[in-house]
Amino acid sequence: MALNLRKNHPLLKIINDSLIDLPTPSNISIWWNFGSLLGICLITQIITGLLLATHYTADTSLAFNSVAHMCRNVQFGWLIRNLHANGASLFFICIYLHIGRGFYYGSYLNKETWNIGVILLLILMATAFVGYVLPWGQMSFWGATVITNLFSAIPYIGQTLVEWAWGGFSVDNPTLTRFFALHFLLPFVIAGLTLVHLTFLHETGSNNPLGIPSDCDKIPFHPYYSIKDILGFALMLISLAALALFSPNLLGDPENFTPANPLATPPHIKPEWYFLFAYAILRSIPNKLGGVLALAASVLILFLIPLLHTSKQRSMTFRPLSQILFWILVTNLLILTWVGSQPVEHPFIIIGQLASFSYFTIILVLFPIVSVLENKLLNL
């Protein structure tokens, strides 16, 4: 009998075991599409980013003009730039939904997969931050100044650390050059870690909406889920194209159409929408070091989630109290996002402080207590 190349070739075998003959639970829903959508986002961002990098100049006197030149004079440069800028937003939408799905259905109990996923989120946030600095507009410059300055809150070594990161005494040419280098490098680190993420996932297999073992009822990934993923790709790429073609500047800040000027501070310095929840938590604490610690904790808290799981059930599918708490948490994050975009004045300060307090209380205190209560109610 002739050898089946797909199943025996050293390289094709890896692809086959990951994308074709992979045993997959028969009941996973649309919420399991986001992993592959994130892969498509990454590929799109790397391709568009590479094309942009061929025309970009990482120098403070030329960066802004090189981006303008790209949009005006390069064939389809405007489209590539708009796809790249809005692709970042879609990337974050997908990753937040992906994390939310993992949280709801108890996927975090695959600890290695979850922890690498959190590291991927942190690197993605770093990549998006350094990328936002590259066009060298007003918000790029001041965003870089404000966020890098936060490291000065670290006791004893803070100021030295900031000046080392800047390559001088303020955000300037050396900063831009190194941020470009990092922005070019990090997506490939993300791609490498994604493979590790998948390797750990395929050790245990996917979770499913019921949160129970599904070894007795697995189906091949192709054609059942490959066709489902293609539908997801189409919907996402259509959304991206619509955003990039009809309202490319919807999610951007108009301040970034002004070249960076160290002598003029914009009235409201704020990051892109996908960082606003963390920015609101940072601002809600009046102390600099406290704010920085809260900012770090707002994302690093994800590492603790597997340790805070007190329920006897994996998924929230049959846990109505936890479901209510989960949707309160989602609403709370939306409130934080909105508050982060508002100026620092009366109603927003207290709303932000309450929402920040609620965020940590729900995750660290209420979820474990409610899970124990549900165990009692269900006599588990």
Curated annotation (Swiss-Prot):
A Gene Ontology term for the protein's cellular component: mitochondrial inner membrane
Molecular function as annotated in GO: metal ion binding; ubiquinol-cytochrome-c reductase activity
Main subcellular localisation: mitochondrion
Details of cofactor binding: Binds 2 heme b groups non-covalently.
Mode of membrane association: Multi-pass membrane protein
Annotated transmembrane regions: 34-54, 78-99, 114-134, 179-199, 227-247, 289-309, 321-341, 348-368
UniProt: heme b b566 binding residues: H98, H197
Locations listed in the record: Mitochondrion inner membrane
Residues that bind heme b b562: H84, H183
Pfam families in alphabetical order: Cytochrom_B_C, Cytochrome_B
Cofactor(s) needed by this chain: heme b
Residues the record lists as binding a ubiquinone: H202
Keywords assigned: Electron transport, Heme, Iron, Membrane, Metal-binding, Mitochondrion, Mitochondrion inner membrane, Respiratory chain, Transmembrane, Transmembrane helix, Transport, Ubiquinone
An example Gene Ontology biological process: mitochondrial electron transport, ubiquinol to cytochrome c
Family statement drawn from the similarity comment of this UniProt entry: Belongs to the cytochrome b family.
Subunit structure as annotated in this protein's UniProt entry: The cytochrome bc1 complex contains 11 subunits: 3 respiratory subunits (MT-CYB, CYC1 and UQCRFS1), 2 core proteins (UQCRC1 and UQCRC2) and 6 low-molecular weight proteins (UQCRH/QCR6, UQCRB/QCR7, UQCRQ/QCR8, UQCR10/QCR9, UQCR11/QCR10 and a cleavage product of UQCRFS1). This cytochrome bc1 complex then forms a dimer.
Note: Heme 1 (or BL or b562) is low-potential and absorbs at about 562 nm, and heme 2 (or BH or b566) is high-potential and absorbs at about 566 nm.
Functional summary from the UniProt entry: Component of the ubiquinol-cytochrome c reductase complex (complex III or cytochrome b-c1 complex) that is part of the mitochondrial respiratory chain. The b-c1 complex mediates electron transfer from ubiquinol to cytochrome c. Contributes to the generation of a proton gradient across the mitochondrial membrane that is then used for ATP synthesis.
The name this protein goes by in its record: Cytochrome b
Highest classification ranks of the organism: Eukaryota, Metazoa, Chordata, Craniata, Vertebrata
Name of the gene this protein is made from: MT-CYB
